[in-house]
UniProtKB/Swiss-Prot annotation:
InterPro entries: MoaE_sf, Mopterin_biosynth_MoaE. GO terms for cellular component: cytosol. Gene3D superfamilies: Molybdopterin biosynthesis MoaE subunit. This is Uncharacterized protein MJ0717. GO terms for biological process: Mo-molybdopterin cofactor biosynthetic process. To Synechocystis PCC 6803 slr0903.
Length: 119
């Protein structure tokens, strides 16, 4: 499930903890934020922020479905911010509900790598 409002993501996270209680062994999470620099050819370059188009949400829905089909996980929640993001702003939050940490971490790594293709 994908969200463009962080508060909705947090609310759904709490709901899923209750819904899946006893079924999941871990929740593997990731939170990404805008840095004060970018890396260009291995060099740090000052950043003023980043622009994220809203069409990324549709692309990320497909990534979530792919991850659910590829890895043995219970559920995936994904928040992604859009518009111009200033330094320090949250870009994304991901929560993977899994029976075991191995599958949870593998799914999370896959999602992050796919997401980075659109940044």
């Amino acid at each position: 499930m994908i969200f463009n409002e962080y508060e909705e993501f947090c609310k759904k996270m709490d709901e899923c903890i209750e819904k899946y209680k006893g079924k999941f062994g871990c929740i593997v999470t990731f939170n990404g934020f805008v840095r004060e620099y970018d890396l260009k050819d291995g060099e740090k370059v000052p950043s003023k922020g980043m622009k994220i188009d809203e069409d990324i949400l549709e692309k990320l829905k497909l990534v979530i479905e792919e991850a659910k089909n590829k890895f043995d996980v219970i559920d995936i929640l994904f928040y992604h911010n859009t518009g111009f993001l200033s330094i320090g702003e949250r870009i994304a939050s991901i929560a993977v509900f899994a029976r075991h940490r191995k599958e949870g971490f593998e799914a999370l790594e896959y999602i992050i790598n796919e997401m980075k293709k659109y940044h």
